[in-house]
């Protein structure tokens, strides 16, 4: 069957054109890259009912479902209603009746109103990782209602620490969780584990004073990674409760 397809309109609806004529790939938003496992049933149902039975973990942490025929897009959008309501509207607090913060009623049977700001990606952060300085998922969900829905082609990556596993340096807005450390000399046994960790994995700002057996720090070049905290066997280094972030602008490569 031949169709006169408005490809731009399909893209705004989060359906990417395939190299196969008349087929599209749905991109389901997953802000921060983590949702309840129950939502995998949505992916499975769409892939097996209207797609080709496969899905791809998108490079921006979306659920990308391939092989959807153009004529099946309305049915897919109608099925997506509950997912969008629960993940974007309820979990992230997105006002779906606005676009770029201007009133625009959303038709819940019509799928995503815009592709706009791309899905916010995040590493696992301190939800799981011993290196994480911040809860990346919570931050992503706070940012989501600020940038979505909109027509701005913005990419935001969140990294939980300066290791930058999520490549915050390579997007429009990169956010990196950093920490300020507090030294507790009364707990320090002078083992030098933190000095070695900083020398090997960070910026060599720590040194062991042989006279006092305590650690000295040159704060000028500390990147806030927290490697000293991770290495210390006696908790002589701890992260301060206040959260800090390094924001990087204009690093997008694609």
Annotate each PLM feature.
Residues 193-212, 223-244:
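Iron-sulfur cluster-binding cysteine motifs and their immediate structural context
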Residues 1-23, 38:
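Intrinsically disordered, low-complexity polar/charged tails and linkers
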Residues 242-246, 251-254:
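A hydrophobic, small-residue-rich beta->alpha segment in the mid-to-C-terminal subdomain
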Residues 21-23, 151, 242-244:
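A general secondary-structure signal for short beta-strands and their flanking turns/coil
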Residues 2, 26-189, 219-221:
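Small-residue-enriched alpha-helical segments and adjacent helix-cap loops
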Residues 15-20, 51-57, 205-208:
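Short, flexible, solvent-exposed loop/turn segments with mixed acidic/basic and small polar residues
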Residues 16-20, 111-116, 239-241:
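Short glycine/proline-enriched loop/turn "hinge" motifs that connect secondary-structure elements
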